[in-house]
């Protein structure tokens, strides 16, 4: 079903001084609940509805009508719970240092665990009913059609499903899961004492996570080195702590892999979307085979920046000095203009979302950094968290996240709740397609070659970040999960060594392409996506499809837009 609940808790803080915020720059979570009291009232109702699921136990095979009745109940309770979870998670996202918001999120997690436990009998009972009878039920009761995919998934994964008692035990441990991600979130957001440095122009730069992403692009090379040394130096201080936390998550994954009788965690995680591990392995092999192309890009970048020895802190600055500010209103208009090829209704829906305050725009102290779209509140609308820095990367980011939002909006509009969700494997197509359309638009309106070079450089950097960098992350994940699956232990220092070796190989350190200081190998601890195991590879697999979709739409190939919108 929905795939965005965990994502909203997997980012970190931001504390860059933002432009003066206007009411329209803050999202309106009151669209979910007017206040916490209303949330509490709904929580009591959902809690009661969860208890009603027990009446279905032992009766799924009674008749097609009974099966539909029970699945309808489970679906309705899940839908209502997701709305509650989005409110709790995004309230915490506004200020992760606020104890009341953390408590609300924890209460949401308790209720979610209770729902999972209450429904734990469904899968083994469907298997006990048997494929033949389920197929007959689907023929007899047309209303079961919306559950066909879920039922087929249950039947497909039968070898990894326990009996009712076993599933209940596994479900009972759900409340204890995900703590490593929560530790990462609070430590990197609320507790880590991020440094402040003085730049060459005399200004001070607060290097929290959003500050790092902003100041790593500065033109002065000595300043960039200062930024990297200070930021990664702070993370290095927490290498032991982050190592224990991440190793805890790896062990948790391995335990569930064994319980579910999978050969390894990679296979288990991919099986959720019925993706064979060969796809993952092929991506990493293809990426490694094409590292010379990445190295050519780095050499070109070094030449354009005028540096004789490319360093890791030379990756992010723009290739030209054309950089200018893109205030949020201009960024939104550029995005709206760029997506016009997707249709008037698409643009209108996006504009409606902007005007209706679906988006939280600027960085604030204790606000989650990065960007995400929370789309699980089926009967409300998506919410977007952004940390807008008035640069072109920020414009590209809002185009990306609004791609997710529109995917969710139109999917929810066209389909009932049980079938409206979509796999991350295709989700990133909608987001990166918008980025491709934005690039095309910006190149068309660029005033001179320097401006065009800025956008082309950004596109190259996007390809590096979305394909090569995510594949590098995927290789690291495959390596460390496999080690723990084999029974090995891992410390923070060992994780840094493993990541550093991969980082240096991808960047051609041994060949002198990009020199990587050992300190920077602590970067693994900074990546929030690692707490969603085997997630990032899907960025790399999606970008090829999205580029083809975008080109076909721009070329107005017959049926191209219809095929894309159907997806």
Residue ranges of predicted features:
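Gram-negative bacterial Sec-dependent N-terminal signal peptides
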Residues: 2-16
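C-terminal, non-catalytic "cap/extension" segments appended to globular domains
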Residues: 19-21, 30-34, 122-130, 137, ...
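Post-HExxH zinc-binding segment in Zn-dependent metallohydrolases
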Residues: 422-450, 459-465, 542
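Short pre-active-site segment immediately N-terminal to the catalytic Zn-binding motif
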Residues: 326, 379-399
